[in-house]
From Swiss-Prot:
It holds the Pfam family Hormone_2. Transmembrane segments: none annotated. This is Secretin. GO terms for biological process: adenylate cyclase-activating G protein-coupled receptor signaling pathway; diet induced thermogenesis; hippocampus development; positive regulation of lipid catabolic process; regulation of appetite; regulation of synaptic plasticity; response to nutrient levels. It is found in: Secreted. Gene3D superfamilies: 6.10.250.590. The keyword Transferase does not apply. It comes from Canis lupus familiaris.
Length: 27
């Protein structure tokens, strides 16, 4: 099955969450 797309999706989610946390820390 598509394992690569899943990992890429997961990494993107993690990155977006980290960005949100960074933005919250800036505010």
């Amino acid at each position: 099955h598509s394992d690569g797309t899943f990992t890429s999706e997961l990494s993107r989610l993690r990155e977006s969450a980290r960005l949100q946390r960074l933005l919250q820390g800036l505010v």
